Amino acid sequence: MRKLFLIMNALIFSGCLGMPKSVKPVSDFELDRYLGKWYEIARLDHSFERGLSQVTAEYSLRSDGGVLVLNRGFSDADNKWKEAEGKAYFVNKNSEGYLKVSFFGPFYGSYVVFGLDHENYQYAFVSGPNLDYLWLLARTPTVETEIIQKFIEMSEARGFDTENLIFVQQK
């Protein structure tokens, strides 16, 4: 099952280093402050996370200067945890929230931070290569309604279909 999870990530993200025209990565991005554990608060549905709850992403430095990515979620249907380990690297400059991420071999997809709590790094709004990929991440399992509303407003303004957001169950 883990192999299927990794293969799906690879197929979906292979060769997808663009971003929606309406999305602009944040500037003044500080990787050191972004590292650590993030909880997935909301997302658009896609096959490689379908049915998962308690989803988290952990980012740490790799010895080659890149970022180690560990995504984890619980499958109620299988009654077990699923994990995917990947790597990420900046696409342009390291002060811009635009990275490429790979969970399988040489295949990379876009990871674009377009909204960020610059002051405390407590939440992030993330896009993939097109308007089908959208996440709200936070340092805590829940966030204030104002943050969710800001996420929805910013995402709608960029053309994302927020009517289909999945709010992730966190324990």
Residue ranges and their predicted role:
Residues 16-171:
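A beta-rich soluble binding module of mature secreted/lumenal proteins
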Residues 4-13:
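Sec-dependent N-terminal signal peptides
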